[in-house]
Amino acid sequence: MKLYVDAGNTRTKWRLADGREGVVASDDISGMERSFALLAGVVTGVFVCSVLGEAFNRRLEALCGQLFGVPPHFARVKQGVLDIVPAYERLDTLGVDRWLGLVFARSHAKSQCSVVVGAGSALTVDLLDAQACHLGGWIAPGCASVEAALGGKVQFARSEAYLKALQSDGALTPPQTSAFGSSTVACVQAGVDAMIRGFLQQVIACAGTEFGGREAVYFLAGGDSPRVEAMLRELDPNLELVLSPAIVLDALVLWSEWCA
């Protein structure tokens, strides 16, 4: 049975072909070993998207050999998959997770223009036109990254009230009804929301220009998807939005079929 692994900056998610799945912190190697040990004797192929570098990849390779007796297949950015033409001159510098997002978008949107938005530790945007040409993208700090940066620089971040406001995924509690905060925590939340909303507004405007006014399908993935989804729907209620929380794992399924 095939095992799909999405090793991201913060979390490593996995899914078996039968639908079983799990998640561990990417720096929790022992947790990953415990999870994968339960799959010994079941896995016959491993397909991986990793942005964690060679040291992690080698450890994963050794673990798969030890537990499953097979080497993992690491996804690599390639020209021509579903006719996609990456914008980068050096393919090895395009994040493989972003490339797989484009693969997933092309497989679903077909000949429609696509915008892939990743709302994780970084906020990423990639555009794909109707001819499958990657028009490039944007990378900015994600919601939690901006909030963490503020928390590390100002004294109030160590206050009990601020720490209680932090949720387990790193995001702050929802803002109050006013657009402006009346406490430090609410001010940080409202300010970050305003920054992200402005970013997304520019995405919609610039994508419209790049696509010559043609409508596009927006694919949204990442841990902050609910927060970003609300902003996108507020900015353009008519936006065609596809929620793809496991876009990398879904794309790995497609990629594994081409590897067979």
UniProtKB/Swiss-Prot annotation:
Enzyme Commission number(s) of this protein: 2.7.1.33
Matching InterPro entries: ATPase_NBD (IPR043129), Type_III_PanK (IPR004619)
Enzyme class: transferase
Subcellular localization(s) per the UniProt record: Cytoplasm
A GO MF label: ATP binding
UniProt binding sites for ATP: D6, A7, G8, N9, T10, R11, T12, K13, S121
Pfam families: Pan_kinase
Pathway membership: Cofactor biosynthesis; coenzyme A biosynthesis; CoA from (R)-pantothenate: step 1/5
Coiled-coil regions listed in the entry: none
Binding-site list for substrate: Y88, G95, V96, D97, R98, T184
Broad class of where this protein is predominantly found: cytoplasm
Cofactor list: NH4(+); K(+)
Cofactor binding note: A monovalent cation. Ammonium or potassium.
Function: Catalyzes the phosphorylation of pantothenate (Pan), the first step in CoA biosynthesis.
UniProt similarity note: Belongs to the type III pantothenate kinase family.
Binding partners and assembly: Homodimer.
Cited NCBIfam families: baf
Protein name, per record: Type III pantothenate kinase
Organism of origin: Saccharophagus degradans (strain 2-40 / ATCC 43961 / DSM 17024)
Gene: coaX
